[in-house]
């Protein structure tokens, strides 16, 4: 079942934690690629100095952050790696959750090809398929084309995992500082990164 629009409403930190254990799905050329979300970071603009929308900054890139919750915010870092975010909070409040790592589930062969141009890969390469925001976007075929797409779409959405299959019974959620935001002054220390402690696909322990 797809997460309904109401899933993305409410406090961004709570939505971030709710996303853990759910499945991010992208249909590419009719083939489902997906992974269980195991690591996220919350960004609470306009007061969060780590957020692109800090100070209410509106640009062509950040405009989608000011829109309705439950949409995709995709951007490039270093001019080459895509990052996928889920927009949260009411219209006009530019907040979102960065998906940092997944455990691959569906379309594994397509994911391997997208990452390594081959399907015969080592154990180390398998562990590196989706353990970072740029890696998971490449694996799932998420690009700037998906920016602003509603997560009620047939081709890009969050699939709710039934309680009996949910990995929350196996892993404890841990909170800590976000990664690679050294510019963000006091926001560097906010414990707004949430992840499953000990999960092999988490990007950084």
Curated annotation (Swiss-Prot):
Enzyme Commission number(s) from the entry: 3.2.2.-
BP GO terms, sorted: base-excision repair
SUPFAM superfamilies per record: FMT C-terminal domain-like
Gene Ontology molecular-function annotations: alkylbase DNA N-glycosylase activity; DNA binding
Covalent S-S links between cysteines: none
EC class: hydrolase
Source taxon at top rank: Bacteria
Keywords on record: DNA damage, DNA repair, Hydrolase
Database matches in HAMAP family: 3MGH
Family classification: Belongs to the DNA glycosylase MPG family.
Protein name: Putative 3-methyladenine DNA glycosylase
Organism: Bacillus cereus (strain ZK / E33L)
Lineage, opening ranks: Bacteria, Bacillati, Bacillota, Bacilli, Bacillales
């Amino acid at each position: 079942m797809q997460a309904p629009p109401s899933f993305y409403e409410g406090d961004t930190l709570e939505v971030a934690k709710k996303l853990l254990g759910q499945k991010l799905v992208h249909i590419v050329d009719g083939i489902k690629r997906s992974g269980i979300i195991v690591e996220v970071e919350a960004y609470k603009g306009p007061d969060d100095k780590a957020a692109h929308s800090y100070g209410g900054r509106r640009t062509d890139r950040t405009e989608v952050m000011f829109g309705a919750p439950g949409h995709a915010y995709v951007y490039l870092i270093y001019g080459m790696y895509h990052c996928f975010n889920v927009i949260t909070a009411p219209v006009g409040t530019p907040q979102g959750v960065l998906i940092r790592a997944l455990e691959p589930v569906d379309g594994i062969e397509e994911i391997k090809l997208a990452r390594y141009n081959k399907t015969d890969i080592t154990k180390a390469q398998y562990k590196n398929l989706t353990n970072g925001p740029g890696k998971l976007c490449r694996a799932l075929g998420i690009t700037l084309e998906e920016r602003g797409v509603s997560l009620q779409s047939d081709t890009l959405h969050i699939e709710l995992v039934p309680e009996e299959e949910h990995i929350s019974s196996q892993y404890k959620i841990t909170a800590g500082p976000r990664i690679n935001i050294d510019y963000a002054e006091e926001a560097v220390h906010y414990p707004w990164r949430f992840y499953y402690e000990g999960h092999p696909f988490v990007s950084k322990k």
